[in-house]
């Protein structure tokens, strides 16, 4: 039985980390694509040479040809320009939109049956454009954002409560940006909702508010510290979690940028919502009920994404 084929489009920091994780977890064979000659080949060879020590048999190949991704089961897209200090995710729009056109056409022509996970920023607009350019079914194209944002939220909460991260559940709604909506009401520690933990004296509303804001600023915090790029370890592990759910038909409940068709009041666009990921791709969107305050924050985030999508249409007339 052939191993799954996983195409990684972009061999930068996230792409290289993804390739290593795929090999370590033995999720499949890897094709690492990048337009920079030598970079994907070098990283693929370096990771392959760690196989004898790590004990994996995955095959890794670096390439500049989309023909090599033919028949891929999963495509994870990281191609594009990363953020640098002082840049917002939205500043990347024009540059990375052109990249998504090239990538979308490459996937359309060579791996039309793949499950596609986009990581390129500004995420919600880029995954929308990628689906448009590729023509793949919307349930087979999604964006990695909510898993990462939720992981950051869970990390900060576990630190605050001094408990295992395994016992913290949390999810983040909305666009992958400053308007994201970390859901306090739907987040728990061992099943105990965060508002109840305030009543129990475990924390205060002020501390939770600060954690929510730090979650929103999570990417910028790392950009500011690194100074030469953006996060890559946590984004890569988040995308692997999604890919594994698809490849193993795990039916995982994971927040991600998915195409909404009326869920949570959103129609005809991608935004961060809780989903079920299995062998059918995005098999279901969980239409959670929101309070008026939560809905207002979510709508504000959706409107920010709409603005970026409209900007994409203005840049590339084929999207209008």
UniProtKB/Swiss-Prot annotation:
Record: active site: 176 (proton acceptor)
Database matches in Gene3D superfamilies: Lactate dehydrogenase/glycoside hydrolase, family 4, C-terminal, NAD(P)-binding Rossmann-like Domain
Recorded family membership: Belongs to the LDH/MDH superfamily. MDH type 3 family.
A Pfam family per the record: Ldh_1_N
Alphabetized GO MF terms: L-lactate dehydrogenase activity; L-malate dehydrogenase (NAD+) activity
One GO BP annotation of this record: lactate metabolic process
Protein name according to UniProt: Malate dehydrogenase
Residues given in the record as NAD(+) binding sites: 10-15, 34, 96, 119-121
Role noted for this protein: Catalyzes the reversible oxidation of malate to oxaloacetate.
Source organism superkingdom: Bacteria
Source organism of the structure: Ruegeria pomeroyi (strain ATCC 700808 / DSM 15171 / DSS-3)
Enzyme class: oxidoreductase
Gene (name only): mdh
Keyword tags: NAD, Oxidoreductase, Tricarboxylic acid cycle
Residue positions binding substrate: 83, 89, 121, 152
Database matches in InterPro entries: L-lactate/malate_DH, Lactate/malate_DH_C, Lactate/malate_DH_N, Lactate_DH/Glyco_Ohase_4_C, Malate_DH_type3, NAD(P)-bd_dom_sf
Catalytic reaction equation(s): (S)-malate + NAD(+) = oxaloacetate + NADH + H(+)
EC number: 1.1.1.37
């Amino acid at each position: 039985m052939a191993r799954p084929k996983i195409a990684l489009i972009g061999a930068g920091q996230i792409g290289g980390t993804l390739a290593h994780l795929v090999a370590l977890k033995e999720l499949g064979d890897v094709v690492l694509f990048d337009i920079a000659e030598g970079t994907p080949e070098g990283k693929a060879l370096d990771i392959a040479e760690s196989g004898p020590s790590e004990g994996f048999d995955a095959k890794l190949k670096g390439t500049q040809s989309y023909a090599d991704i033919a028949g891929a089961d999963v495509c994870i897209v990281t191609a594009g320009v990363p953020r640098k200090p002082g840049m917002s995710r939205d500043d990347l729009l024009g540059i990375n939109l052109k990249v998504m056109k090239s990538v979308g056409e490459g996937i359309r022509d060579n791996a039309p049956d793949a499950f596609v996970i986009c990581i390129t920023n500004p995420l919600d607009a880029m995954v929308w454009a990628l689906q448009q350019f590729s023509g793949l079914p919307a349930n087979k194209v999604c964006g990695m954002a909510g898993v990462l944002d939720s992981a950051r939220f869970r990390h900060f909460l576990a630190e605050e409560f001094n408990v295992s991260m395994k016992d913290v559940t949390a999810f983040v709604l909305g666009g992958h940006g400053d308007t994201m909506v970390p859901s306090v009401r739907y987040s728990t520690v061992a099943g105990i909702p965060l508002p109840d933990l305030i009543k129990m004296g475990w924390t205060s509303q002020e501390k939770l508010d600060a954690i929510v804001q730090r979650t929103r600023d999570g990417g910028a915090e790392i950009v500011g510290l690194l100074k030469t790029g953006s996060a890559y370890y946590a984004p890569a592990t988040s995308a692997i979690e999604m890919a594994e759910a698809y490849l193993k038909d795990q039916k995982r409940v994971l927040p991600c940028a998915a195409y909404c068709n009326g869920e949570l009041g959103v129609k005809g666009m991608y935004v961060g919502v809780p989903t079920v990921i299995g062998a059918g791709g995005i098999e279901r969107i969980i239409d959670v009920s929101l309070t008026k305050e939560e809905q207002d924050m979510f709508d504000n985030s959706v409107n920010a994404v709409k603005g970026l999508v409209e900007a994409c249409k203005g840049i590339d007339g084929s999207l209008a």
